[in-house]
Curated annotation (Swiss-Prot), chain A:
<dbReference type="InterPro" id="IPR019407">
    <property type="entry name" value="CTU2"/>
</dbReference>
<keyword id="KW-0963">Cytoplasm</keyword>
<dbReference type="GO" id="GO:0002098">
    <property type="term" value="P:tRNA wobble uridine modification"/>
</dbReference>
<dbReference type="GO" id="GO:0005829">
    <property type="term" value="C:cytosol"/>
</dbReference>
<dbReference type="GO" id="GO:0032447">
    <property type="term" value="P:protein urmylation"/>
</dbReference>
<dbReference type="GO" id="GO:0016783">
    <property type="term" value="F:sulfurtransferase activity"/>
</dbReference>
<dbReference type="GO" id="GO:0000049">
    <property type="term" value="F:tRNA binding"/>
</dbReference>
<dbReference type="GO" id="GO:0001403">
    <property type="term" value="P:invasive growth in response to glucose limitation"/>
</dbReference>
<dbReference type="GO" id="GO:0007124">
    <property type="term" value="P:pseudohyphal growth"/>
</dbReference>
Curated annotation (Swiss-Prot), chain B:
<dbReference type="GO" id="GO:0103016">
    <property type="term" value="F:tRNA-uridine 2-sulfurtransferase activity"/>
</dbReference>
<dbReference type="GO" id="GO:0032447">
    <property type="term" value="P:protein urmylation"/>
</dbReference>
<dbReference type="InterPro" id="IPR035107">
    <property type="entry name" value="tRNA_thiolation_TtcA_Ctu1"/>
</dbReference>
<dbReference type="GO" id="GO:0002098">
    <property type="term" value="P:tRNA wobble uridine modification"/>
</dbReference>
<keyword id="KW-0819">tRNA processing</keyword>
<comment type="function">
    <text>Plays a central role in 2-thiolation of mcm(5)S(2)U at tRNA wobble positions of tRNA(Lys), tRNA(Glu) and tRNA(Gln). Directly binds tRNAs and probably acts by catalyzing adenylation of tRNAs, an intermediate required for 2-thiolation. It is unclear whether it acts as a sulfurtransferase that transfers sulfur from thiocarboxylated URM1 onto the uridine of tRNAs at wobble position. Prior mcm(5) tRNA modification by the elongator complex is required for 2-thiolation. May also be involved in protein urmylation.</text>
</comment>
<keyword id="KW-0963">Cytoplasm</keyword>
<dbReference type="InterPro" id="IPR000541">
    <property type="entry name" value="Ncs6/Tuc1/Ctu1"/>
</dbReference>
<dbReference type="Pfam" id="PF01171">
    <property type="entry name" value="ATP_bind_3"/>
</dbReference>
Amino acid sequence: MSDSHSHSDILLCQRCNKNHASVISRKEKFCTDCFRNFVSLKQRKQMMSDQYYQDIFKVMYKDKLRSEQDAHLQNLNSKILVPLSFGSSSLVMLDILNDTLLEQSITHRGKTGFTVDVIICFHDEQIQNQIKENVSKLINAKYKENNQKIKFHLVDINQFFDNSPHLQSLVLQETDFLIKSLNLKDQSIIEKKLTLSEILDQCSDRSTYQDLLAFVTKHAIKKYAFQHDFKAILWGHSMTRLADEVISLIVKGRGSAISSSLNTDDFDENYGNKFKNLYPLKDILLTEIDAYCYNSGLHNYLINYNIQDALLVNKINQNTDKIQTNSLKNKTINELARNYFEVIEGDYSNVISTVVRTGDKLAEPKSQENFKISKCNLCMQKIYSDPSQWITSITENKGHPLETDEEKENYQRWKNYNNDKLKNSEMDFFRLNEFVKENGSKACLCYGCTITLNTFKDKSVVWPVHDDKELNSVLEDYVLTDHEE
Amino acid sequence: MFTAPSDPVNVRKELKVTQLCELCHSRKAIIRRPKNLQKICKLCFFHVFETEIHETIVSNDLFYRGERVAVGASGGKDSTVLAYVLKLLNERHDYGIEIVLLSIDEGIVGYRDDSLATVKRNQQQYQLPLEIFSYQDLYDWTMDDIVETAGIRNSCTYCGVLRRQALDRGAAKLEIKHVVTGHNADDMAETVLMNILRGDVARLEKSTSIMTSSTGSPIKRSKPFKYCYQKEIVLYAHYKKLDYFSTECTYAPEAFRGTARELMKNFEAIRPSCIIDIIASGESFVLKQKMGKQNKKKIITYNDGNRCERCGYLSSNKICKACMLLEGLEKSRAQIKIQVQVPGEPQQEGPAKVLRTLERLTF
Ligand SMILES: [Zn+2]
Ligand SMILES: [Zn+2]
Ligand SMILES: [Zn+2]
Ligand SMILES: [Zn+2]
């Protein structure tokens, strides 16, 4: 593909017919300005997609519906939360929001319809300094003028456990795939304090690790939105990212969660119905975002992200091979789905949008007969049918009878072995698990989380009880400014 | 006192407890089930494999006593194991069904000849009646002729359309109203992914149904292997030493399906349970009701009495799918002759177009 673009000086932007084209997207040649416009318009279209969002983003004035005071208050209270991961998408989205604020400021004599709070989550101490440095660089280079309208908050997601008044132990019974849970009111059952990394270390594969981390991060963001009265969370997901999310949810047995995770119409019911979730970049491919990111100089602020130059007229010539060396076995489900879309984008360009559109057509599942819809103790997703019942209905869990003396002998040895294991172990996880199985109550886990728990070393996990207390226990944040060291 | 060393024949290596089957805890585990990662022994594997299929049959009421059931037998591993297990379960649990092996001879030289020979041996081995219908008999076309005319790219879909109706027609001729096929969990999962990737909304909700019947056909179809992993079917055939023909259909899937298949292989490599997980997802799919478009939701009721004008086969359309397809083939056979004279002219009325029309008809 690159060969045909090598004579870049011949290419003219097809929008303005003046400037040289720097990006080729959807079979059209764009100059940097026209492409920025193209992407920006698509984001703004999503931000104006219905009345609720229009009320947030538009600059309000006194009219039939509201007094001057009301209008002023509405502008002031239109707070949106923007999670920033320092990947290309969230940086680009923030850039477009900044432009929107600047434009409003100019056309409305200093007034804006909304304010932006950026939330940056981290769990690894080492990355903290780089985040601080990048934020201060960003503010100085880009957001000085909107100093009052865009604020940056740093949240340490290790608070996940410290921040939870009640912990529970969730244990999977292998025989019937039922989940037993026990509230650990008396935390002394566990000798030392639990940390997020200890829980994450129990994951047997990278996929599960990333899923748990993603949940904990999302939980922190939504909890923050709940506690600080935000009207909406603007997620930076590109169309490509949403497509890989849809596929990954299906592959993880979480297909029933697709409709709720793509839902931008309703308030988030897991967090007190206080805010909605919006995906302003859902009409834009990741390759397009990367092109925007690079052409706007935003690539200087990326952390742990490699930009794709597929649509750029002048290739960046960076060592993209590095990403590919990660072997197939080490990839997560999301990464595999992402790879698939990256490869397929050339030959079947509409597959990505098809997947997102199809995902959008899915409704909330019907609940199984005689099944009371409940919520997953782990991921808070709604459960529409009993996973353990489904699994046991398609999985036989009895064996072929014992026949020979040797077999009977082996069986006896196995029994003794297990008894010894139980006797000799201290109050560790094995003991605790047996205790929970005997004394715990039946808990609800969604199908996906049941499968996740099955891949854990001990088939168990200690997890916060997601209740009102937990939701209201204050999440500490740290405000970042432009003068970090 | 002298003790004789024990007879070396009786010395056996004592199995470590961790090597034991996780179900019976008494025999050596030799298989790790992809479904739940359980390590089990051979005898327990036979038991769970057969019992799970039995459970699927019973909980979905697939059969009724006295029903005559045709097993679509291709000689491949899926259908061979299906014939074997169905016969076994029918005897073990007394379903009271009558099983007939039904084979279609597409006329694929080299592939079909050998696989038909396998089916014929299966007939002897399992003592089940066998009926063979050929494309030549049913459509006056062989698969090799079709490929020559339609191009190899579309052959699998063609093959599917024709084979599907061929099985139905064959069953109808035998006055059998139920065809069981060896579609397994892997096929099911692939279909779910394909329907999402292609945006095939019309088929999305039904991607995972165990029982289907195509429009225009009085024959119902079921898939007792819906929850069986391909890998376990192969293992079962292997350990039971079943006689099957191991070569896959020589006509490769169309390119896009190929990409989906590879994607699924990759998923499976990092998470073996994903096949059943995808089916779990697929079973939850419900489409949003379109608002303000109620008038569009008119249900086209199928008149049972309709028959194809050409061949008399039951069909909701004036001309049945197979006849449509054959008409297209006739056209393109003529066109190929023209195209030889006018090279470079884009093919307008080709089989691909007919195929698209046909696919729309299916909904
Ligand atoms: Zn331009
Ligand atoms: Zn869950
Ligand atoms: Zn066993
Ligand atoms: Zn016909």
